[in-house]
C-alpha cells in the first residue's frame, strides 16, 4: 500500500511534528510512504493519512488537503475550535465558521457564531473551546479515524462519526541512556514541562509547591516552556515567595529537554479542561521512569493507577497535589519502575507502527472495494437506462453498502 502522509514536521514547533519524526522511519519499514509538502502537488497514493491538531498554522494546509480528498485522519486532539476559526475567520471566510458551528450545534451554534463575528461575544476558541469542539468538519471527511484514547474515540462516535476507527497508542521514544543535565538541581527537583498557562494548572502547581517547600526547603521547581501572553509567571512567583525556589527556562530543543527531564526527581503534567489531547511529555516522562502527577481527566485518566498519580480537578486539588508531590518523592523508585514497564509494554514503537500499517492497509483496501462497487453501480445504471447514477451512489453510501 502507498500512503500520502500529511503532517507538520520540524522545524515546526509542534508536538505532532515530533510525533511524526518518531513514527515515520518505523512506518516506512512496513509500507510505502510519500510525505506531502505544503504548497506542493498532492502525492499519488492508495490512501492519504492526515495528522490533525488544533494549531491552524501547523495544520491548516493539512485540513485544506483533507477537504479535497477524504482519507484516514489521525485526531491528535478532539477540540479543534482554534483550527477551524483559523482556516475560516482567519481567512476572511465567516460563513465557513458559521457552517462549522451549525454542523456541531445546530441553529443555536450558528447564532453564537454570528455573535462572535459581530463582536457581541468573546472569541469562543479562547474562552470556552471545550464546549464547542468543532471537530465535525474534520470527522465528516474521515474515511477512517485513528485516535490515541478511548476518550476521543467515544466523543467522535457521539458526534456522529460512524466509520472505521482504530485506537493506536502514542509511541514511546527509544532514547537510550540520557545524561541528566547538571545545571539544574534541587532536593528534590520537581519538573513541569510545556506551555505555561491556566489550562496547565500552573497556578495550582505553584501553590502546592510553595506548601511543599515549607516542609522541604531544599525543593526546587523547574518550569520549562513559553508562558501564555496573559499569564504573568514572575508576578505569581513573587506573590508566593518562590523567586528563589523556581527556575524558569523558555522553549528548549529536544535533546536539552530530555536531559532536563532526566535530572528531575518528580514530573508534573496537569491540565484542565482537556482538549482530548495525548501528551508527548507524559510519554517521555514515563519512558524515563519518572514518578509523574497528572490531572484525572481525558486520556490521562486512562493511564493505570499504579503508573501515575492522578489529581482530581476540584476544590481539593491543591491540597492533594501538595501531598502527592511528597508521596512521589518518597516512592519514586517504585512509581518509576512501573512507569517504564508500562510504556515499554503498551507504547513500543514497532507495535505502534505495525498498527498504523495494518489500519492503512485496511483503509486502502476498503477504499478500493468501495470504488469498485460504486463503479459497478454506475455501470449497471447506464445499462438499464438510469441517468442519475450519482444519486444511486449516494443512496448506496447512505444505506451503508459502501462508506
PLM-predicted stretches and their roles:
Residues 193, 220-233:
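Glycosyltransferase donor-sugar binding loop
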Residues 340-345, 349-403:
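C-terminal amphipathic helix plus adjacent low-complexity
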Residues 143, 261-276, 290-291:
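Acidic donor-binding loop of glycosyltransferase active sites
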Residues 98-144:
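Membrane-proximal helix-turn-helix segments that form the acceptor-binding/catalytic region
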Residues 183-200, 206-209, 222:
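Conserved donor-binding/catalytic core segment of Leloir-type glycosyltransferases
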Residues 151, 171:
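Carbohydrate-associated surface elements
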Residues 187, 233-255:
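Nucleotide-activated donor-binding/catalytic signature segment of Leloir-type glycosyltransferases, i.e.
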Amino acid at each position: 500500500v502507498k500512503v500520502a502522509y500529511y503532517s507538520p514536521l520540524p522545524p515546526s514547533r509542534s508536538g505532532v511534528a515530533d510525533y511524526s519524526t518518531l513514527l515515520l522511519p518505523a512506518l516506512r519499514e512496513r509500507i510505502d510512504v510519500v510525505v506531502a509538502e505544503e504548497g506542493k502537488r498532492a502525492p499519488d497514493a492508495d490512501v492519504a493519512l492526515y495528522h490533525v491538531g488544533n494549531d491552524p498554522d501547523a495544520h491548516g494546509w493539512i485540513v485544506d488537503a483533507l477537504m479535497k480528498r477524504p482519507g484516514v485522519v489521525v485526531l491528535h486532539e478532539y477540540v479543534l475550535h482554534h483550527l477551524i476559526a483559523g482556516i475560516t475567520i482567519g481567512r476572511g471566510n465567516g460563513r465557513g465558521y458559521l457552517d462549522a458551528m451549525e454542523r456541531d450545534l445546530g441553529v443555536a451554534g450558528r447564532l453564537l457564531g454570528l455573535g462572535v463575528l459581530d463582536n457581541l461575544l468573546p472569541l469562543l476558541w479562547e474562552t470556552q473551546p471545550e464546549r464547542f469542539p468543532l471537530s465535525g468538519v474534520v470527522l465528516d471527511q474521515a474515511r477512517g479515524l485513528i485516535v490515541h484514547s478511548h476518550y476521543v474515540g467515544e466523543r467522535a462516535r457521539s458526534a456522529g462519526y460512524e466509520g472505521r476507527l482504530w485506537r493506536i497508542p502514542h509511541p514511546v521514544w527509544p532514547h537510550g541512556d540520557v545524561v541528566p543535565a547538571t545545571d539544574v538541581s534541587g532536593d528534590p527537583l520537581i519538573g513541569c514541562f510545556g506551555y505555561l498557562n491556566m489550562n496547565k494548572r500552573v497556578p495550582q502547581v505553584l501553590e502546592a509547591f510553595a506548601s511543599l517547600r515549607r516542609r522541604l526547603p531544599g525543593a526546587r521547581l523547574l518550569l520549562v516552556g513559553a508562558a501564555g501572553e496573559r499569564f504573568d509567571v514572575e508576578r505569581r512567583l513573587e506573590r508566593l515567595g518562590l523567586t528563589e525556589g523556581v527556575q524558569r527556562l523558555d522553549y528548549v530543543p529536544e535533546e536539552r529537554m530530555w536531559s532536563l527531564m532526566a535530572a528531575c526527581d518528580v514530573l508534573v503534567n496537569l491540565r484542565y479542561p482537556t482538549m482530548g489531547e495525548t501528551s508527548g511529555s507524559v510519554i517521555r516522562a514515563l519512558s524515563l521512569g519518572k514518578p509523574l502527577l497528572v490531572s484525572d481527566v481525558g486520556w490521562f485518566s486512562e493511564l493505570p493507577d499504579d503508573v501515575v498519580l492522578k489529581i482530581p480537578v476540584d476544590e481539593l486539588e491543591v491540597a492533594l497535589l501538595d501531598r502527592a508531590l511528597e508521596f512521589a518523592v518518597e516512592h519514586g523508585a517504585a512509581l518509576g519502575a512501573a512507569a517504564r514497564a508500562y510504556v515499554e509494554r503498551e507504547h513500543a514503537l514497532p507495535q505502534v507502527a505495525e498498527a498504523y500499517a495494518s489500519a492503512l492497509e485496511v483503509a486502502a483496501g476498503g477504499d478500493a472495494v468501495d470504488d469498485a462497487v460504486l463503479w459497478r453501480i454506475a455501470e449497471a445504471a447506464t445499462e438499464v437506462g438510469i441517468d442519475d447514477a450519482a444519486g444511486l451512489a449516494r443512496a448506496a453510501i447512505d444505506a451503508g453498502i459502501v462508506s
